[in-house]
Amino acid sequence: MDMKRRIHLELRNRTPAAVRELVLDNCKSNDGKIEGLTAEFVNLEFLSLINVGLISVSNLPKLPKLKKLELSENRIFGGLDMLAEKLPNLTHLNLSGNKLKDISTLEPLKKLECLKSLDLFNCEVTNLNDYRESVFKLLPQLTYLDGYDREDQEAPDSDAEVDGVDEEEEDEEGEDEEDEDDEDGEEEEFDEEDDEDEDVEGDEDDDEVSEEEEEFGLDEEDEDEDEDEEEEEGGKGEKRKRETDDEGEDD
């Protein structure tokens, strides 16, 4: 997919001015140049052009709010003066895996006064003697080179990202967590109500069982009384019969 079409798809019916992040990794650039990216992206803070076949950044539009630029795995060998001209507020630049051979090719980056982090992994320039010392001397505004400061202390994760973009993502994550907490609270309330309903139903069932047992007990007592009465009547009948038989014998 070419770069122009990819940009159109990434817009998703938004205006360029509404876009803060734009990822165009692995798309195709014609003639090794940036295409379809215009100065209308005035609020863009993060731009990623990894492995798009770039040879030059000469077509880069002016992006006054851009803080982080990913240009790794391309074929850029020079012409970095355009970065200072077009990206005055750039703080993070990744040029890893490009065709940069000499320290002198990095000299235009001196004009990027806000530049805080620079990555040059897998560039030939990193094989030079005193590479790190030379780059830090050339670019005194740098805090981190290839993820480490002048004292070889590793950069914390927060310094490897754009602050503004990270804050927005953290806010969104916080809102998602709050929503999940609210849902969990509602589920707990529903569970408690269900437990109460079950307890009430259980009490009602116990009452019904008790009433049935009482009724059953009364029925048994009534049956016992009826049997006793029948036995008494039967005994009286036998007694009368004996008396009658005795009178007949006397006659």
Swiss-Prot record:
Residue spans of the LRR repeats: 16-40, 43-64, 65-84, 89-110
Presence of keyword Phosphoprotein: yes
Sequence positions bearing N6-acetyllysine: K86
Organism: Homo sapiens (Human)
Modification after translation: Some glutamate residues are glycylated by TTLL8. This modification occurs exclusively on glutamate residues and results in a glycine chain on the gamma-carboxyl group.
Purpose: Multifunctional protein that is involved in the regulation of many processes including cell proliferation, apoptosis, cell cycle progression or transcription. Regulates the proliferation of neuronal stem cells, differentiation of leukemic cells and progression from G1 to S phase of the cell cycle. As negative regulator of caspase-3-dependent apoptosis, may act as an antagonist of ANP32A in regulating tissue homeostasis. Exhibits histone chaperone properties, able to recruit histones to certain promoters, thus regulating the transcription of specific genes.
Residue numbers spanned by region Disordered: 149-251
Annotated protein name in UniProt: Acidic leucine-rich nuclear phosphoprotein 32 family member B
An annotated Gene Ontology molecular function: histone binding
Domain LRRCT: 123-161
Keywords for the protein's UniProt record, in alphabetical order: Acetylation, Chaperone, Cytoplasm, Host-virus interaction, Leucine-rich repeat, Nucleus, Phosphoprotein, Repeat
